[in-house]
Amino acid sequence: MVKKAYYRSFQAVFNVGARCLVWRRPIPVSGPGSICQIPGILKKEKVTKAMVVTGPNVGKKLAPKILAELDRAGISYITFMEVESNPSVNTVNRIQKLYLDNACDGFIAIGGGSPMDAAKAAAARVVRPNTEVGKMAGLLKVGKKLPPFLAVPTTAGTGSETTIAAVITDSETHHKYALMDLHLVPKYAILDPEMTRELPKKVTSTTGMDALTHAVEAYLCWTYNTNESIRLAEEAVCEIFRYLEPAYRDGDDMEARTQMLIAAYKAGFAFTRAGVGNVHAIAHTLGGLYNTPHGLANAVILPIVLEDYGEAVYEKLAHLAELTGVKYSGTDAEKAKAFIDEIRAMNRRMEIPTGFDFIQEKDIPQMVEWALAEANPVYPVPVVYDKKRCEAVIRRIIDEA
């Protein structure tokens, strides 16, 4: 009880301070072919040599389209195409060194959350060269304006193109932590559905559920919410319920692809402003220990945690059930449960598992420790977990596999 009172007091004070900050959204450039506008943006920002950051798959398939645009415009660039899933401190430091050694003056991050997070953290190290990545973990520890930064999402889900966060994994301990600073918000978000056309179905599904988790958790984090973040979270949930499965079934459905990018953008800003919760805190432990893709972890954990919250979230989930057309009548409890059931049904239709059987017994105490340390006191979660309850949720994730 004492800890819970402290957490709520911390959140109340933080909320007062947060409302005094300027919460900038990236400038969106959207629509099919919008990557063609990148050279003009770079020239406007006076970037003469760009640091292009991505992963190996995107580097082979999608990055060449952007590099061709830079070549045609006569803009120099250096590439780093080795970002792994759940990027490490070592990767961040390699990008920073490459940037400085080649006198780059701007970033283009192409891909899902991993390349964007790695590039953000590297950009933070560029402006804070004497500060190790781990020393910038937590809130508002970057404190300096980044070089011009363009984010080009190739998945509709992570929201990294809009957020203040960069999630990095310690190379030695495998602990996953977040840098959170307003300066980490990219200046531009290039939302080109052509960049998501060839996504594997399993990536479309899990990153889409990642976006849904962002929107739902932000919506439930009432303390930090504003009218804008509430509206964007509601819109994102509705758009994901409508467009995710069509995008999953048909990668060439450009309307669905476009709307999913916009939904992910909205959800990204909503959780940037309002926060996330216990779903993310537990999911990050799976990424750190087992390299579980973040969207997959969120997709599996979301309905389990929502059920565990129980009546603390019935009213809000009932409203989402009405907005999405899942259920209009009945009690709040009935509508909330119908909403959770529909999330499970979406997972099932997109062949997402119901749990994880790879979690090892010996790792559960570490998972509990990391999850509670991430969530508290910063996240204004609907239900504050203690060790016993967090462990029980993790065991449900195992049992439901």
Predicted features along the sequence, with ranges:
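ATP/NTP phosphate-donor binding region
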Residues: 2-106
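C-terminal catalytic subdomain
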Residues: 274-338, 344
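Carboxylate- and glycine-rich phosphate/diphosphate-binding segment that chelates Mg2+/Mn2+
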Residues: 165-274
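C-terminal charged capping/lid subdomain of soluble metabolic enzymes
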Residues: 2-9, 317, 327-401
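Glycine/threonine-rich beta-strand-loop-alpha-helix active-site module
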Residues: 90-191
